[in-house]
């Protein structure tokens, strides 16, 4: 989620930079864009540090491990639920007989 916030901020910044430019020479635009991109890079690095995203691949790895654990717990829960349903079904048949 944090990654998407940073990506959205980057996209908005690029759109704002593109919209705010008036007709200038190509060199002046390139120089201004380079300065703006440097400022934007510093700003986004600050955001990433604040959100502790500098090790994002590790974060993705951790999410994968968490998802695998959750998947195993859900599978175990489902198996117990099926067993319980079979027990209840057997009890119901016994009572009806």
From Swiss-Prot:
Belongs to the cationic peptide 03 (latarcin) family. 07 subfamily. A motif (Processing quadruplet motif) lies at residues 60-63. GO terms for molecular function: toxin activity. Residues 1-22 form the signal peptide. It comes from Lachesana tarabaevi. Residues 23-63 form a propeptide. Keywords: Secreted, Signal, Toxin. Expressed by the venom gland. The mature peptide (64-97) probably forms alpha-helices which disrupt target cell membranes. Does not have antimicrobial or antifungal activity. Does not have hemolytic activity against rabbit erythrocytes. However, it causes some conductance changes in planar bilayer membranes, without membrane rupture, suggesting a cytolytic function on other biological targets. It causes paralysis, but is not lethal when injected into insect (M.domestica) larvae. It comes from the Eukaryota. Its main location: secreted. This is M-zodatoxin-Lt7a. It is found in: Secreted.
